[in-house]
Structures are given as structure tokens and as C-alpha cells.
A protein has these predicted regions:
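Short aromatic-glycine motifs in intrinsically disordered, low-complexity regions
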Residues: 30-42
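Alpha-helical protein-protein interaction elements
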Residues: 34-36, 47, 66
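Phosphoinositide-dependent membrane-docking surfaces
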Residues: 41-58
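Mixed-charge, low-complexity intrinsically disordered segments
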Residues: 54-79
Length: 79
């Protein structure tokens, strides 16, 4: 049986920094032009892409993941 045992929110900034957030320990909300993580605001004009990485576990010996794009700045070609 496959199940998700951990989710990680990844925020890729235009200055090539990446913020990794464990969703089980942090609250986040997506808005039209910003994202808030534990009451700290990040505006999309500074972000290239936001993805959700879901770690899947079929059995206790193998770990795989899938990464889904939640938001992307399509005007910016730097992914």
C-alpha cells in the first residue's frame, strides 16, 4: 500500500534560494499574490515557483516522492 508520510513545501525564489517547509510542523496559506508561512509573508513577485513534495512509502525499505507545482511564475523562464 502506498501512502504519503511526509509533505514538504518548497519555495523557489528568483535569487536562486529555496525555502523548505515541513507542512506537518508549519502552517501556510496561499493567496492570490502571496504565501504566508507561520505569519511571515512572501510575495510572488520574488518567487519563481512553489511546489509540494510528497514523500511516499510503499514499504519501510523504499522511499520515493512526487513533486507537484502549486504556483509558478510563467513569465519567468528560470525554473
Amino acid at each position: 500500500m502506498i501512502y504519503i508520510y511526509k509533505e514538504e513545501l518548497l519555495i523557489y525564489f528568483k535569487n536562486h534560494l529555496t525555502l523548505s517547509i515541513d507542512t506537518s510542523k508549519n502552517n501556510f496559506k496561499l493567496y492570490q499574490n502571496k504565501i504566508t508561512v507561520n505569519h511571515k509573508t512572501y510575495y510572488f513577485k520574488h518567487i519563481s515557483k512553489i511546489t509540494l513534495k510528497e514523500y511516499l512509502n510503499e514499504d519501510y525499505d523504499t522511499d520515493t516522492y512526487r513533486e507537484r507545482t502549486l504556483w509558478a511564475n510563467w513569465k519567468n523562464d528560470k525554473f
